[in-house]
Amino acid sequence: MRIDKFLQSVGLVKRRVLATDMCNVGAVWLNGSCAKASKEVKAGDTISLHYLKGIEEYTILQIPALKNVPRKDTHLYIAPKTKE
């Protein structure tokens, strides 16, 4: 699944266009490198979202089969990375 579609599907961003724009300006990182919107993601990958307020990191647990994941089921697909 493309990273922009994944971000929208699990609810980290509201619209896929916004996810694409974030990738274009370098605000989305995948496994430590800047990711283009078309980059494929898989279970076990780490996503970093660079916001003005700071960086949020998530680990992908599995790829959703549904177009949109209900908010109550988001924890099945991503897990926030803990700070050490």
Curated annotation (Swiss-Prot):
Q: Which GO terms describe its biological process?
A: translation
Instruction: Tell me the GO molecular function terms.
Output: rRNA binding; tRNA binding
Matches recorded under SUPFAM superfamilies: Alpha-L RNA-binding motif
What SMART domains does this protein map onto? S4
Which keywords does UniProt give here?
Protein biosynthesis, RNA-binding, rRNA-binding, tRNA-binding
Q: Is this entry keyworded rRNA-binding?
A: yes
Q: Where are the transmembrane segments?
A: none
Q: Which domain of life is it from?
A: Bacteria
Residues forming the S4 RNA-binding domain are 1-64
Query: Has UniProt tagged this entry with the keyword Glycoprotein?
Result: no
A Pfam family of the record is: S4
CDD domains reported in the protein's UniProt record? S4
Q: State how it assembles.
A: Associates with stalled 50S ribosomal subunits. Binds to RqcH, 23S rRNA and the P-site tRNA. Does not require RqcH for association with 50S subunits.
Q: Its function?
A: Key component of the ribosome quality control system (RQC), a ribosome-associated complex that mediates the extraction of incompletely synthesized nascent chains from stalled ribosomes and their subsequent degradation. RqcH recruits Ala-charged tRNA, and with RqcP directs the elongation of stalled nascent chains on 50S ribosomal subunits, leading to non-templated C-terminal alanine extensions (Ala tail). The Ala tail promotes nascent chain degradation. RqcP is associated with the translocation-like movement of the peptidyl-tRNA from the A-site into the P-site.
The family note in this entry says: Belongs to the RqcP family.
According to UniProt, the name of this protein is: RQC P-site tRNA stabilizing factor
Q: What is the source species?
A: Helicobacter pylori (strain ATCC 700392 / 26695) (Campylobacter pylori)
